[in-house]
Amino acid sequence: MIPAAYPTREEIARLTARMLLEIGAVNFNTKEPYILASGLPSPSYIDCRKLISFPRIRSTLMDFLTVTVMRNAGFEAFDNIAGGETAGIPFAALVAERMALPMTYVRKKPKGYGRNARIEGAMSEGQRVLLVEDLTTDGGSKLSFVDAIRETGASCGHTAVIFYYDIFPETEKTLGDHGVALHYLCTWWDVLAEARAQKAFDEVTLSGVEAFLKDPRAWQAANKR
């Protein structure tokens, strides 16, 4: 049951951003940009994995993620909660516990043979699976996990993340074209607003990050090394 006292979507976004800032998960550096897995530079980087070491914040955000999924998708919409290797595993376990559902995880690469070679745990044909991850940038890695789940004969039409970059306009369309709805707690825009409110970084840095968020590809082209 969702208690009436649960915060609104907007309040969840603000509180999530505040908590991520509090634990030092948010990193801004416009002078020495971070290099993403794609090889492109970024003045912002977030480490949601740090959440597992902060039990009070971790518990609150998992409550938020669970209620967000239930509000958006329904109370009886799933039969199995799957985490993506490796960052999604602890969060999937915590959500599964709250929803009283079985938990599995999806490997990045197959182990063994057969259509369940990428699945650890018990996943059955026909089950409705929610994929849980820490974050998503362009949605690409989610589709790989979704495909692995569907190969078992289960269905997967929803993915839930703590953090969504929300700077690449094609992300939700890419997921939607594959029949996947995205649920999330907060975005870079929420973090930027909260960081400004807290004066967590100097205004030069915040303005530089804002320029990146408004046009990431142009910023990356100008700052490519």
From Swiss-Prot:
GO BP, one annotated term: pyrimidine nucleobase biosynthetic process
Family: Belongs to the purine/pyrimidine phosphoribosyltransferase family. PyrE subfamily.
Domain of life: Bacteria
Function per UniProt: Catalyzes the transfer of a ribosyl phosphate group from 5-phosphoribose 1-diphosphate to orotate, leading to the formation of orotidine monophosphate (OMP).
Gene3D superfamilies per record: 3.40.50.2020
Regions crossing the membrane: none
Gene assigned in the entry: pyrE
Keyword Lipid metabolism among record annotations: no
Subunit structure: Homodimer.
UniProt enzyme class: transferase
Alphabetical list of PANTHER family matching this protein: OROTATE PHOSPHORIBOSYLTRANSFERASE (PTHR19278), URIDINE 5'-MONOPHOSPHATE SYNTHASE (PTHR19278:SF9)
Organism: Ruegeria pomeroyi (strain ATCC 700808 / DSM 15171 / DSS-3)
Keyword Mitochondrion among UniProt keywords: no
Stated name of the protein: Orotate phosphoribosyltransferase
Alphabetical UniProt keywords: Glycosyltransferase, Magnesium, Pyrimidine biosynthesis, Transferase
Gene Ontology molecular functions: magnesium ion binding; orotate phosphoribosyltransferase activity
Pathway per the UniProt entry: Pyrimidine metabolism; UMP biosynthesis via de novo pathway; UMP from orotate: step 1/2
Required cofactor names: Mg(2+)
Classification via Pfam families: Pribosyltran
Catalytic activities: orotidine 5'-phosphate + diphosphate = orotate + 5-phospho-alpha-D-ribose 1-diphosphate
EC number: 2.4.2.10
